[in-house]
Amino acid sequence: MFELVITPRVSETDLAGHINNTTLPVWFEAARAPIFQLFHPRQDYRNWKMVIVKSTLEFKKQIYYGTNVVIRTWVKNIGNASLVLHEELYQEGSLCAVNEAVYVNFNLKTQEAEMIPLHIRNELLLHFYEDNDLRSLNGLN
């Protein structure tokens, strides 16, 4: 599991007094930085390969300014050229949002998906998603 703590900013708060719903996709992307680092250790954007093809965000509770949030990211599935990420956002210990993101290892020059290299696949497996019952036993919920 990857974990990122984010301090909500005043500018991310909307007129209803909570964090605007357009902010969460940006936060979830920020939490994926360690995964991007696996695919792009030198951060060479000319050879970027991680292309998002789907993101499904479910809001569970409102999120507020003034209290840090914690985003936890797991690898849910690894295909030949794609991976599915499971992401959860917590504030004060409460689950506030769940996101699932699908990425493809895509070669922008050839415009084709490429197989995820074995060394990256092995590293991703270290962060594999456990089902909710096992996570509760481990104190992650």
Regions found by a protein language model. Name each.
Residues 1-70, 76-141:
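Terminal targeting signals and extreme-terminal segments of soluble enzymes
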